[in-house]
Curated annotation (Swiss-Prot):
Role noted for this protein: Positive regulator of FPS1 glycerol channel required for the glycerol efflux.
Organism the protein comes from: Saccharomyces cerevisiae (strain ATCC 204508 / S288c)
The protein, known as: Regulator of the glycerol channel 1
Positions bearing Phosphoserine: 136, 249, 252, 481, 537, 652, 765, 813, 866, 879, 918, 966, 969, 975, 1059, 1081-1082
Biased composition annotated in UniProt, kind: Polar residues: 13-31, 549-570, 983-992, 1043-1061, 1071-1083
InterPro entries, per the entry: AH/BAR_dom_sf, BAR_4, PH-like_dom_sf, PH_domain, SLM1/RGC1-like_PH
Cell compartments where the protein resides: Cytoplasm
Protein family: Belongs to the RGC1 family.
Note: Present with 300 molecules/cell in log phase SD medium.
Annotated positions of the Phosphothreonine modification: T817, T857
Length: 1083
């Protein structure tokens, strides 16, 4: 658009000072001049003449100063302000011009009108900016460099400044991306260096060239190349191959993969430490590669695109500057001309209206050029020219703004695309970092327990380490009772009596202290009671002779006096802690007296005399010394002429019993020679002679204590019983009966004590039964003639219907009974070492130790009960129908109760409990209590000895009135002692056998049996059961009566089956010595 509006010069040559505006004074209209090219826009000379003629002044004088309304009236409101801002009710809207803010007004413009700077100011500012510009940049960019001045409010200038700022943003982004690419490249080099720093010499590694998994522990041996084969040989081989039938290819079965690597750790990929080298190297290698990729992507894609965009933006800024001329407009001058013509038109119309109303004919005469029609025509043509200029300016604005909008959208989208690409690269780097390091560690070594490597290491070295995992409990140390070997419960290997005695031989004049052990076949004399000390120990040296009258004498025979333990053979626990090892020299007795050729010559309360053949195991000088004193017994090969009878036996036969057999058959002559030499030495070191030994009570004081006297009586009675038999088999049967009667008696005492007492006393020997049972009491003896030839092992078939309780008892019976305990004390038949306090306020019960054949593997359980609980629970019933406690025998001699839930046969439950339930006349309720699990309360029909499937494994006392026919379990119906052992007492309410454990019942009301009286004694904590007259059993033959009648009344103990308190507790001596809570299972 050209600047066609110019201000014409006045006659005096000056330019009009101020153009006329609508609403100006009348004199201002005279100074208005139109541009020279007004005709080119449709203007005529008549319009100019009419517009600027001097005779048109009368029209202009008729109109007011301004015809434009100040305020636009509201719709439906006739009140408005006039041109002077005063309210006038008589103003008509059609007589005034609308304001320029109204789109209907001829003065309204709907776009901004650009303002030009003065020529001198614009040139000076442009020159100043060009001088400060960088010669390397474009002129258009340098002009709009940021400075302290504001940008001119012009459309092109504003947009150029806008895109100049975008160029600066692109320049900063390009600089940042260059630095980011450089930093990624540097970090990639660092990651490669860190990858090379990961060095574990023996873990699985990544090969640098191929990135394959390799095991550094496996040495790489070079593969041998095949030798070249000549062509003739190849043809010959191919000919043979065609003739021979090709066998089928055999596919080798792949060996099972080893779970452990060659380094000793778990295999790679199992989440072990073996993965750490591959994980770290893989992480740094992948991260370095990704960072190199990011650097190349930034330099090759992001930065070039931003650089090209910046260049294109510079070109577009030049194009915008070229549009600067499109915004040069004279719309303001057109508005002024329109205002002049509009005022003339309004004045002519007003003049004619006023003349017609007043009737003045002079006023109606207007000049022809001031005809309202002609003035309106000129006004419409001017308005048309004004609208054309206005539309042209609008098109310029639309063109510029739409182009700028598209350009900025392109710039913004390019920046978005570059940032999105960069963000995707960084995101891939972060995901790679999380995947290759974090996830690998979290799913691998971080998710494993700390001991997984140790468990794998231990399991792969079974030859040098125990297969003990971290979650496994530590293995229990094996005890001697856990060892199983043939004949481990043979009665021939039992210790009958042990302790210190004073001995006097025929050649000596004084008594000598010695440690004696009475077994099934021999009476051995040892140096000391400590079998765990070496021969160089101070305790193995000779000690002074101990006589009953003088303890400070020196031992003349050279035997070891030892310490002064109790008469039962127990040692001081402080001394047992210093034992270091087992010395073979301490296990050989000084002398041994065979019971097969021995007889009890005399016995009193304080002494007894034995005659027989003695074997000496001392060195040769001892044998020579003894032979010099008794010339008639010097040669062991002579036949003894005296004492002919059952004791007559050649010394050679006696000597062979005690000679240990160390020889082994071998085909090598040297070994045979060596064995013969050893046999000759052993024969020379053993001497035999007929002796007569006198024994006395050993006591630390001048007078023996009652306990020592009592123990000495037991020695006398046991020796009497053992020397009365002619063969080892008879003596073995006697020991078996002794063990059985002792256990039944102890269990009965335990049951009685748990009912009527709250204290525990030491164990009473089974020999005392013969002393304490009165003739009037009911006794039951065993017939040894019927049982002399009984089988020592009864095979019980394991049928399918055998109940679980019987099977458990069979398995629990396979528990070894050691001959010596952990403290070095010898185990004595019929007695247990009781460690419970004497007051009986608390007791300890342990479950059986785990044995190779026992299904029960639980740890030891401890039950502590006070006296109050015992008293409170003693009034309850021992058992109820269906509740059968089980007994397990441990190596400590204790009993633990297996719950009755182990039984699967309900008939077996009821049958086992019937022996207890038959005592009561009415049904009682059962209250579970821990007291019911105590020893002595369980039925006697359970296995009481540890011999599996043997004689002592047969359930005893399997007889009851309520158990007949199908009520008996298959296990008990197969027992050969079921019918043989049944006897009936006077009351008729229960049946009893020789091996029956007396069951005690709680207090109840008096029933039909008039002999039973229930009452509460004064001061007693619980009710007790008393009898008016004793219960007896008649027609029972005494055991071993046919073997030796002279000793039957004194030697054989009798087992009582009386179930009252009087018969069990009213004893002549040692009434406080009751049976402990634990059974004698350790014998």
């Amino acid at each position: 658009m050209s600047d066609y509006f110019t201000f014409p010069k006045q006659e005096n040559g000056g330019i009009s000072k101020q153009p006329a505006t609508p609403g100006s004074t009348r004199s201002s209209s005279r100074n208005l001049e139109l541009p020279k090219n007004y005709r080119s826009f449709g203007g005529s000379s008549d319009e100019l003449a009419s517009m600027y003629s001097a005779d048109s002044q009368y029209l202009m004088d008729m109109i007011p100063d301004s015809l434009t309304l100040k305020n636009e009236p509201a719709s439906g409101n006739t009140q408005m302000n006039g041109p002077d801002g005063k309210e006038n009710k008589d103003i008509k809207l059609d007589e005034y011009i609308l304001p320029k803010t109204d789109p209907r007004s001829p003065y309204y413009i709907n776009m901004p009108i650009p303002k030009k700077l003065p020529k001198s100011e614009g040139k000076a500012r442009a020159k100043q900016k060009v001088n400060r510009a960088d010669p390397s940049d474009l002129d258009v960019e340098n002009i709009y460099e940021t400075s302290g001045e504001f940008v001119r409010e012009y459309p092109t200038d504003i947009l150029i400044d806008r895109f100049h700022k975008w160029k600066k943003i692109l320049k900063s982004l390009i600089a940042y991306f260059r630095e980011a690419a450089y930093s990624q490249e540097q970090i990639a080099r660092i990651n490669y260096q860190m990858k090379n720093a990961v060095k574990f010499a023996f873990l699985t590694d990544l090969e640098d060239e191929t990135n394959k998994l390799v095991d550094p522990s496996i040495s790489k041996l070079p593969t041998k190349k095949p030798q070249p084969v000549p062509l003739a040989a190849q043809k010959l081989d191919s000919k043979y191959d065609t003739d021979v039938e090709q066998p089928q290819s055999i596919q080798s079965v792949p060996s099972e993969e080893v779970a452990s690597a060659s380094s000793g750790f778990m295999k790679f990929g199992s989440g072990s430490i073996q993965d750490i080298q591959v994980i770290l190297k893989k992480y740094h290698l992948s991260l370095g590669s990704q960072q190199y990729k990011i650097s190349k992507e930034i330099l090759a894609y992001i930065i070039p695109k931003l650089t090209d965009l910046r260049k294109d933006l510079t070109t577009k800024m030049k194009e915008i500057k070229e549009l600067n001329g499109d915004f040069k407009t004279n719309i303001g001058e057109h508005i002024k001309i329109t205002s002049r013509l509009l005022n003339k038109y309004i004045a002519s119309v007003k003049l004619l209206d006023e003349a017609s109303t007043s009737g003045d004919k002079q006023g109606e005469k207007l000049k022809p050029k001031h005809d309202p029609y002609l003035l309106k025509l000129q006004l419409d043509l001017q308005l048309k020219r004004q609208l054309l200029e206005e539309n042209y300016l609008r098109e310029a604005f639309l063109n510029l703004q739409s182009a700028a909008l598209q350009l900025e959208k392109i710039v913004y989208s390019k920046i978005q695309s570059a940032l999105q690409r960069y963000s995707a690269l960084i995101d891939s780097e972060a995901r790679l970092m999380i995947k290759n390091l974090c996830h690998e560690l979290q799913q691998g070594i971080l998710s494993r327990p700390p001991a997984v490597e140790w468990d794998n290491f231990v399991s792969h070295h079974p030859t040098c380490l125990m297969n003990l995992k971290s979650t496994d409990p530590p293995p229990q140390p094996r005890r001697l009772s856990d060892i199983v070997y043939p004949n481990m419960k043979s009665p021939l290997a039992k210790c009958i009596r042990v302790g210190y005695l004073l001995k006097k031989t025929e050649s000596s004049k004084s008594f000598t202290k010695g440690y004696f052990v009475l077994t099934t076949n021999y009476l051995h004399e040892f140096k000391s009671s400590d079998f765990f000390l070496d021969s160089k120990s101070p305790r193995s040296k000779n000690k002074p002779v101990v006589e009953q009258s003088d303890i400070s004498r020196v031992n003349k025979d050279g035997t070891n006096a030892g310490s002064h333990p109790s008469s039962k053979g127990t040692q001081d626990p402080k001394l047992t802690k210093r034992r270091k090892g087992l010395s073979s020299s301490n296990l050989y007795p000084i002398s041994s007296l065979s019971l097969n050729d021995c007889s009890l010559k005399d016995s009193t309360d304080s002494t007894f005399v034995l005659q027989g053949y003695a074997s000496y195991h001392s060195p040769e000088d001892t044998c020579t010394k003894e032979s010099s004193t008794t010339s008639d017994l010097a040669c062991p090969t002579k036949t003894l002429a005296s004492n002919k009878g059952k004791h007559q036996r050649t010394p050679s036969a006696l000597s062979m019993v005690s000679v240990p057999k160390f020889l082994k058959s071998s085909s090598v002559p040297k070994e045979q020679k060596k064995a013969k030499e050893e046999a000759n030495i052993n024969k020379k070191s053993i001497c035999e002679k007929r002796v007569e030994w006198t024994f006395k009570i050993f006591s630390a004081s001048l007078e023996p204590t009652p306990e020592e006297s009592k123990n000495f009586k037991k020695w006398v009675q046991d020796i009497k019983a053992l020397t009365s038999f002619n063969s080892t088999q008879e003596r073995s049967n006697f020991i078996e009966e002794k063990i059985l009667k002792s256990r039944n008696h102890n269990n009965g005492k335990s049951s009685q004590r748990s009912k009527n007492s709250t204290y525990i006393t030491p164990v009473d020997s089974f020999v005392n039964l013969s002393e304490k049972v009165t003739p009037s009491s009911s006794v039951t003896t065993l017939n040894t003639r019927k049982r002399a030839n009984r089988p020592r092992y009864i095979d019980i078939p394991k049928s399918a219907n055998m109940n679980a309780g019987a099977m458990n008892s069979v398995y629990r019976s396979k528990v070894n009974t050691p001959a010596i305990d952990e403290n070095g004390n010898l185990a004595i038949v019929g007695e247990t070492k009781n460690s419970a306090p004497q007051n009986g306020m608390s007791y300890t019960i342990r479950t059986p130790c785990k044995s190779p054949y026992s299904p029960y593997t639980g740890e030891g359980m401890l039950y502590n009960r006070s006296a109050d609980n015992l008293m409170a629970s003693s009034s309850r019933k021992a058992s109820a129908p269906g509740e059968v406690p089980q007994i397990a025998v441990s190596n400590h001699g204790d009993e633990a109760i297996i719950p009755a839930s182990a039984y699967s046969d309900s008939s077996h439950k009821s049958s086992r409990a019937s022996s207890v339930a038959s005592i009561h006349n009415q049904r009682v309720d059962f209250y579970p209590s821990p007291l019911m699990n105590l020893p002595g309360v369980s039925p006697s029909c359970l296995a009481l000895d540890g011999n599996a499937n043997g004689y002592f494994g047969i359930p005893l006392n399997c007889n009851s009135e309520a158990r007949r026919g199908s009520d008996l379990s298959p296990f008990e119906m197969e027992s050969p002692l079921f019918e043989e052992n049944r006897t009936q007492n006077c009351s008729g309410s229960r049946k009893s056998s020789a091996c029956h454990i007396p069951h005690q019942c709680g207090p109840r009301k008096e029933g039909n049996d008039s002999r039973l009286i229930y009452g509460n004694e004064k001061g007693a904590s619980q009710s007790r059961l008393t009898l008016k007259e004793p219960l007896t059993s008649k027609g029972v033959e005494a055991p071993y009566s046919s073997l030796k009648k002279t000793y039957s009344a004194e030697n054989v103990p009798l087992t009582s089956t009386v179930s009252n308190d009087k018969s069990l507790h009213s004893r002549k001596e040692g009434s406080t010595n009751t049976v402990p809570a634990t059974s004698a299972s350790s014998k």
